[in-house]
Curated annotation (Swiss-Prot):
Presence of keyword Transport: yes
Annotated source species: Bos taurus (Bovine)
One Pfam family it belongs to: Ammonium_transp
This protein's name: Ammonium transporter Rh type A
Ranges facing Cytoplasmic side: 1-4, 76-78, 192-210, 263-270, 314-331, 393-426
GO biological process: ammonium homeostasis; ammonium transmembrane transport; carbon dioxide transmembrane transport; carbon dioxide transport; inorganic cation transmembrane transport; intracellular monoatomic ion homeostasis; methylammonium transmembrane transport
Extracellular side: 26-54, 100-124, 167-170, 232-241, 289-292, 353-371
Length: 426
């Protein structure tokens, strides 16, 4: 770890710098170099680009704060949850910028606009979702490799969906959420260890770790309308995406609370359900968020997604572990996979009702199938690569433990008092 990780991290960053030198330039660089007198035109381009900055800022907060804190629910893995999240996102946004730009420019130099940066953040979200499936069972070296491989596959599938099939997926329920979840599940299946079949002693949350994770959920919940509307190409579509996501999220919260109480003993609420299933409405409405659907349609989608997510955590996650040998640490299948599929199906139905030409409906269905199939194949290949012992995967007894890869402060006496106080509150 001492040499493998620094060498790989520095090597990858050097590669990124070289690729940026070869392919990337500011939006105004070409305009001013061709004609120095075209400063007004260049300024207008930048002004238009900057209109997207509030959306970029919201998405950026989701990536680094939302997903980061959501991963801190394990009581001895908080440093890695939020820290490796930062590492993945920082490397991923650079590689996402390059690989997506190369696809769209067909190998030529390309200009950086705010939309490029939003799409780069989107590409990192796929890896962060997959990270949730293998949380606590992989090394930082493995996550660097997975970041590069997954974003490459994601960019190829995204190009297929949007530039060849011409499907609609504004909030990317299919291309980000379903893709990221099933990619992660495929990797988790390959990396499955029978030694972790019985629940690990570190695979637990405590009162304060769940509170930190809930903060992450709130960041994601608040900014999700921006996520689903950031790449819409018209103001009216952005407006529809914001409104539909807003109400879909609200509906999923109410349904998630109700189903959690229904399924838990004595009607109590389960914090795992609340942290995750309350976000399912934002995932599920993404594909058709900008389409001309009434708000109640978005609320129905959100309600279904919230219920399905809770039932998934209660019944499917244990089934996946015991029967399919897929250990999904964060339950990404329930927050991103199933709601992503629901979003894809909702998009197919909406397009079928709106369009008289069946070609568009077929394209939507093909996009959903492509996203899942590409994710599974890419995940299986990536998992096989990550399984090579050289990448410093932690042994079973050291899983879900920060001290393997981090300098962790020793617990002081006041820490014990703090934990005792929390336990009394709990």
């Amino acid at each position: 770890m001492r040499f493998k990780f620094p060498l790989m991290a520095i090597g990858l960053e050097v590669v990124m710098i070289v690729l940026f030198a070869l392919f990337v330039q500011y939006e105004t660089s070409v305009n001013t170099s061709r004609n120095p007198n075209e400063t007004e035109s260049a300024a207008m381009d930048v002004e238009k680009t900057m209109e997207s900055y509030p959306f970029f800022q919201d998405v950026h907060i989701m990536v680094f704060a939302g997903f980061g804190f959501l991963m801190t629910f394990l009581w001895k893995y908080g440093f890695s949850g939020v820290g490796i999240n930062l590492l993945i996102a920082a490397l991923g946004l650079q590689w996402g910028t390059i690989i997506q730009g190369i696809f769209r420019s067909h190998g030529q130099k390309f200009l950086i606009e705010m939309k490029n940066m939003i799409h780069a953040d989107f590409s990192t979200v796929t890896v962060l979702i997959s990270f949730g499936a293998v949380l606590g069972k992989t090394s930082p070296v493995q996550m660097l490799i997975m970041t590069i491989l997954e974003i490459t596959v994601y960019a190829a599938n995204e190009y297929l969906v949007f530039k060849i099939l011409w499907a609609s997926d504004t909030g990317e329920s299919m291309t980000i959420h379903a893709f990221g979840a099933y990619f992660g599940l495929a990797v988790a299946g390959i990396l499955y260890r029978s030694g972790l079949k019985e629940k690990h002693s570190n695979e637990e949350s405590v009162y304060h770790s769940d509170l930190f994770a809930m903060i992450g959920s709130l960041f994601l919940w608040i900014f999700w309308p921006s996520f689903n509307s950031a790449t819409a190409d018209e103001a009216k579509k952005q407006y529809r995406a914001i409104v539909n996501t807003y109400f879909s999220l609200a509906a999923s919260v109410v349904t998630a609370y109700a189903c959690s109480s229904l399924l838990e003993s004595r009607g109590k609420l389960n914090m795992v359900h609340i942290q995750n299933a309350t976000l399912a409405g934002g995932v599920a409405v993404g594909t058709c968020a900008d389409m001309e659907i009434p708000p109640y349609y978005a609320m129905i989608i959100g309600s279904i997604a919230g219920a399905v997510s809770v039932f998934g955590f209660k019944f499917l996650t244990p089934l996946f572990t015991t029967k399919l040998r897929i250990h999904d640490t964060c339950g990404v299948h329930n927050l991103h996979g199933l709601p992503g599929v629901i979003g894809g199906l909702a998009g197919i139905i909406t397009v079928a009702l709106e369009e008289s030409d069946s070609t568009k409906t077929v394209s939507q269905a093909a996009a959903l199938g492509s996203s899942i199939a590409t994710a599974l194949v890419g995940g299986l290949i990536t998992g096989a690569i990550l399984k090579i012992p050289f990448w410093a995967q932690p042994p079973d007894e050291d899983c879900y433990d920060d001290s393997v890869y981090w300098e962790v402060p020793e617990r002081k006496e006041y820490d014990n008092h703090f934990h005792e106080l929390l336990s009394t509150l709990h």
